[in-house]
UniProtKB/Swiss-Prot annotation:
It holds the Pfam family SPT_ssu-like. Belongs to the SPTSS family. SPTSSA subfamily. Component of the serine palmitoyltransferase (SPT) complex, which is composed of SPTLC1, SPTLC2 or SPTLC3 and SPTSSA or SPTSSB. The heterodimer consisting of SPTLC1 and SPTLC2/SPTLC3 forms the catalytic core of the enzyme, while SPTSSA or SPTSSB subunits determine substrate specificity. SPT also interacts with ORMDL proteins, especially ORMDL3, which negatively regulate SPT activity in the presence of ceramides. Pathway: Lipid metabolism; sphingolipid metabolism. InterPro entries: Ser_palmitoyltrfase_ssu-like (IPR024512), SPT_small_subunit (IPR051900). It is a multi-pass membrane protein. GO terms for biological process: ceramide biosynthetic process. One of its GO terms (molecular function) is serine C-palmitoyltransferase activity. Residues 39-43 are lumenal. This is Serine palmitoyltransferase small subunit A-A. It comes from Xenopus laevis. Its main location: endoplasmic reticulum. The record marks 37 as: Within the serine palmitoyltransferase (SPT) complex, defines the length of the acyl chain-binding pocket, determining the acyl-CoA substrate preference.
Amino acid sequence: MKVLCEDVNGPRSSLGRAWSHMSWLYYQYLLVTALYMLEPWERTVFNSMLVSIVGMALYTGYIFMPQHILAILHYFEIVQ
């Protein structure tokens, strides 16, 4: 089992490189947002709030943007 884990997470396998890249991106996220200074439970609360706010913004944009775009196109008489 240990050999299998080393092969998957090794630096030469594509899965290992992808994992290393995702780890590096997560580390950059922690540094840029200064989350590395928070305790784990505080980090979880912050990330939960961030995911919920982004999710609500995406959902709202998906539901309401087509109506607004169509209204703008009707206003400028691009669409009859």
